[in-house]
């Protein structure tokens, strides 16, 4: 087989297509969770912490004090924006929680499906024919 034929064959395998689908869905899910964190959860956290917006927290390494991060950057000061790290950690925890919830629900559904009793198998065709033969003999 040629290179492109091998490549096409590997793409057509179910595992590759499943992985591609998972990546696309994961990207979309990440955007949804990111929006939920940024637009819903972080404002609530901000209210609970007295109106603190973590993304604006920074330390200027030159030792000077600036009104905000934009002013420090305009002045050319090197800054440690630790607020962005806090925001990323919170995002990670929330995304991990949502993924855990989804996986747990999928596991429960799978266990429920496996535990569902199967209907008892009826008599086989051979058994039915034997019964008919016996009835006809009577």
Curated annotation (Swiss-Prot):
| Presence of the UniProt keyword rRNA processing in the record | no
The main location class comes to: membrane
Where it sits in the cell: the answer is: Cell inner membrane
- Gene3D superfamilies linked to this entry: Large-conductance mechanosensitive channel, MscL, domain 1
Name the residues that span the membrane. Answer: 9-29, 32-52, 83-103
The alphabetical list of record keywords is:
Cell inner membrane, Cell membrane, Ion channel, Ion transport, Membrane, Transmembrane, Transmembrane helix, Transport
The ranges of region (Disordered) come to 113-133
Could you tell me which SUPFAM superfamilies the record lists for this protein? Gated mechanosensitive channel
Bilayer topology annotation: Multi-pass membrane protein
One Gene Ontology cellular component: plasma membrane
Q: Which InterPro entries match?
A: MS_channel, MSC/AndL, MscL_channel
One function term, GO molecular function aspect: mechanosensitive monoatomic ion channel activity
Quaternary structure (record) = Homopentamer.
What does the UniProt record say this protein does? Channel that opens in response to stretch forces in the membrane lipid bilayer. May participate in the regulation of osmotic pressure changes within the cell.
Membership in a protein family: Belongs to the MscL family.
Name by which UniProt lists this protein: Large-conductance mechanosensitive channel
| Organism (species) | Flavobacterium psychrophilum (strain ATCC 49511 / DSM 21280 / CIP 103535 / JIP02/86)
Traced from the root, the source organism's taxonomic lineage reads: Bacteria, Pseudomonadati, Bacteroidota, Flavobacteriia, Flavobacteriales
What gene does this protein come from?
mscL
């Amino acid at each position: 087989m040629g290179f492109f034929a091998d490549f096409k064959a590997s793409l057509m395998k179910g595992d590759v297509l499943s992985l591609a689908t998972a990546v696309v869905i994961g990207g979309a899910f990440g955007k949804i969770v990111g929006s939920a964190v940024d637009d819903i959860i972080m404002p609530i956290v901000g209210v609970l912490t007295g109106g603190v917006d973590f993304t604006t927290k920074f330390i200027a390494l030159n030792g000077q004090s600036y009104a905000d991060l934009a002013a420090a950057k305009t002045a050319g000061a090197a800054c440690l924006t630790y607020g962005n790290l806090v925001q990323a950690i919170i995002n990670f925890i929330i995304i991990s929680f949502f993924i855990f919830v989804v996986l747990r629900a999928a596991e429960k559904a799978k266990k429920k499906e496996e535990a569902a009793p199967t209907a008892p198998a009826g008599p086989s065709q051979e058994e039915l024919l034997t019964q008919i033969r016996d009835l006809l003999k009577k």
